[in-house]
């Protein structure tokens, strides 16, 4: 029998917000059912309209605030209500941190079935103009005869939010978005550029133009003039990721750089490489991870998901040896390059399938006293399942997804005999619901 789709009640409703969801939406209880409302804060009475009715929950659109929360602030960005780049600008920065810390501890309790012996003070940074990496969509609109440059709309990702500024982006891009739009408006093939990747180092900013067709000579000239006038490195991407090349300056090397001044280390990276988006927070995160490791001169450390050596190289200055393992061969090459340029010799790097600990052990036949894990959002499930084969006394786990951290914590604590000593959040992405966290496990 065909299911009858519930009809939307389009009349406005009033409800009190009782909590926040993991993605920062307000939660109201209407007739005993959870209703998620973007932009609403706990304690507020809001007027809303249903946008989706499901079996277990509903979703609604915020129409007005009847009783505002004392936690509410005026968003700095004029595009905030539509743009999908942020989700928490209406909440004070201090409350954002409290929300993220509470969310982490709740997940560790609910899914990790444990709680840390102590809670780390949150790591924070400047919460404007922090974002050094981003992907901007572009589209030339025939009706308007103008180009849209921006992030996808929050409520309809098929569409682009046309923005003139972005206060979370690197300050140079923040002020130059208008000029980017004007550049594409003047090109002969206005439909050629599908997106623009932004990557900033400490001293340079690179733009990667995804060109769907070969550029005309005139368009190449316009891009060169733009890059020269506004001082950008420009890369073109005519195909897949391996097609990216440095277009301007034509004689320039392809790398940007960032520094960890406390360790006198400079990293070079390609604009396509994975690097942390928030340079200030990254410096604090590396220092906290090393402090939690309590490294000794005799320690041999395993750095899993090591990337270009962001943790490996500074750790190597405090221990006997670091072995870094990474799934991406290009990043392993980059890690070796950075070790060499910084004259760090007590490190080795390997490419391996990090879902197969036995493959890692076959490459690295040594004992490790300590392990650092910095996995992608999917977490480190296979590693923690097989952690016995490594048998470290101490594990520092850097996480970009608190749900998978909680899952892996459950295994480490309740199956493998580790104790969760401490944990806390690191606000890598202010004004978003994204939660970066760090946890320390000690063998029981």
From Swiss-Prot:
Question: In the record, what terms sit under GO molecular function?
Answer: 4 iron, 4 sulfur cluster binding; iron ion binding; RNA binding; rRNA (uridine-C5-)-methyltransferase activity
Its BP terms in the Gene Ontology are: rRNA base methylation
Domain named TRAM: which ranges? 5-64
Residues bound to S-adenosyl-L-methionine are: 276, 305, 310, 326, 353, 374
Q: Which Pfam families match?
A: TRAM, tRNA_U5-meth_tr
Q: Which residues bind [4Fe-4S] cluster?
A: 77, 83, 86, 166
Q: Which reaction does it catalyse?
A: uridine(1939) in 23S rRNA + S-adenosyl-L-methionine = 5-methyluridine(1939) in 23S rRNA + S-adenosyl-L-homocysteine + H(+)
Q: Which domain of life is it from?
A: Bacteria
Reply yes or no: does the keyword 4Fe-4S apply.
yes
Enzyme Commission code(s) on record: 2.1.1.190
The reply to whether Amino-acid biosynthesis figures as a keyword in the UniProt entry is no
For this protein, the record's PROSITE patterns field holds: SAM_MT_RNA_M5U (PS51687), TRAM (PS50926), TRMA_1 (PS01230), TRMA_2 (PS01231)
Spell out the catalytic residues: 400
Keywords annotated in UniProt: 4Fe-4S, Iron, Iron-sulfur, Metal-binding, Methyltransferase, rRNA processing, S-adenosyl-L-methionine, Transferase
Q: Which InterPro entries match?
A: 23S_rRNA_MeTrfase_RlmD, MeTrfase_TrmA_AS, MeTrfase_TrmA_CS, NA-bd_OB-fold, SAM-dependent_MTases_sf, TRAM_dom, U5_MeTrfase_fam
Q: Which family is this protein grouped under?
A: Belongs to the class I-like SAM-binding methyltransferase superfamily. RNA M5U methyltransferase family. RlmD subfamily.
Q: What does this protein do?
A: Catalyzes the formation of 5-methyl-uridine at position 1939 (m5U1939) in 23S rRNA.
Q: What is this protein called?
A: 23S rRNA (uracil(1939)-C(5))-methyltransferase RlmD
| Gene source species | Legionella pneumophila (strain Paris)
**Encoding gene, per UniProt annotation:** rlmD
